[in-house]
Amino acid sequence: MKMPLTWGSWFLLSAWILNAGAEISITPEPAQPAEGDNVTLVVHGLSGELLAYNWYAGPSISLTFLVASYIVSTGDETPGPAHTGREAVRPDGSLDIHGALPGHTGTYILQTLNRQFQTEVGYGHMQVYEILAPPTVMANDTALVERRDTLRLICSSPSPAEVRWFFNGDALPVAVRLGLSPDGRMLTRHGVRREEAGAYQCEVWNPVSVSRSEPLNLTVYFGPERVAILQDSTTRTGCTIKVDFNTSLTLWCVSRSCPEPEYVWAFNGKALKNGQDHLNISSMSADHEGTYTCIAKNSKTLLSGSASVVVKLSAAAVAMMIVPVPTKPMEGQDVTLTVQGYPKDLLVYAWYRGPASEPNRLLSQLPSGNWIAGPAHTGREVGFANCSLLVQKLNLTDAGRYTLKTVTLQGKTDTLEVELQVA
């Protein structure tokens, strides 16, 4: 009486009867399946009339790794301990895996039994590739100081995959790739450079899937460098800037710096109340002659730099002259009769309404620096150390000729006239 063949009985038989001439091979279709694909482990090289198949998912023939046993004559399939609920054996011995998962990756063994109760064994390997989720770029810091700080970027992904890096949308430059770890997941740059500031991304990939991270933006602080003072926001630079009397001048402080530096201006060594990148002189006079210095300070790098320039009246402005400011004053306004090129060794001066005679004297300045009112003073005139005369709240009767008389320490006397018009 023949005993029926069961998976348990033939598993025991197969453990000791082996046909040494086995040439069975196993290949997956598709060859590089993605997770979720239906995969068939196709068997090649089967010979003779076969009674049964055993499929194993593991490195050896062991009950622990048994996926399923299949009886050819009846079509009965019995799942084993390693069956995941997705496997099915075909009559030709191939194994279908429905919706394969990365966990199905590994070695597969097919064991066959023929009518002589001999077994043959075939081996194959299958790699199920994940559909990769976007990785994340993590940094030790996203704002670093040039040549001082170290940059460390990590491409974080839960999946085993190849890694590529991108910088500002392009493949990472060769020089930067030198800082990659062997697995490509960590990028290290000692003494980071300004040209390495930008957007970094990493991309994970396998034969069936590619996924790129969101960009991580890196800022590299540097400077200030090449601090310079420009005239009127142009490229005109130099140690000395010559300006015509009563004209305007704008000095611009420029530098190469990230972030934009803080600015401090000084005039002849004395700090000015100006925190801007430019300094305006609205009406050039002898009082504005001197050395202007701009100091640029970077709060991130803790570095600073400075530049200086000498501002002088132009040669054409050296001769003494009087210019009303504003040039066309209106009734009710104040006007300053500004003196250009007044003597540096001035002893005294006097202003007159009309010709230089005592009854017409408005005011005069004494060697002490104080000024005293003259017979023609109306109470609206004020004198300054630079010889200028302020006339307040003009009326139409203030129009006419004004005369300035100066005396130097050497006794040189000069007289200068100006015609004031009041609109």
UniProtKB/Swiss-Prot annotation:
Disulfides per UniProt: 155-202, 253-294
UniProt KW Glycoprotein keyword: yes
Signal peptide: 1-22
The organism's place on the tree of life at top rank: Eukaryota
Extent of Basic and acidic residues compositional bias: 84-95
GO cellular component terms listed in the entry, alphabetical order: extracellular space; stereocilium tip
SUPFAM superfamilies: Immunoglobulin
Residues carrying sugar: 38, 217
Listed PROSITE patterns: IG_LIKE
UniProt-listed Pfam families: Ig_2, Ig_3, V-set
Compartment(s) of residence: Secreted
CDD domains referenced in this protein's UniProt entry, alphabetically: IgI_hCEACAM_2_4_6_like (cd05740), IgV_CEACAM_D1 (cd05774)
Gene3D superfamilies according to UniProt: Immunoglobulins
Residue span(s) of domain Ig-like C2-type: 134-219, 224-310
GO molecular function: identical protein binding
Keywords: Disulfide bond, Glycoprotein, Immunoglobulin domain, Repeat, Secreted, Signal
GO terms (BP aspect): sensory perception of sound
Keyword Disulfide bond annotated: yes
Primary location: secreted
Chain positions covered by the region annotation Disordered: 77-96
Its job: Required for proper hearing, plays a role in maintaining the integrity of the tectorial membrane.
Entry's family note: Belongs to the immunoglobulin superfamily. CEA family.
Assembly and oligomerization: Homooligomer; can for homodimers and homotetramers. Interacts with TECTA and TECTB.
The protein, known as: Cell adhesion molecule CEACAM16
Gene behind the chain: Ceacam16
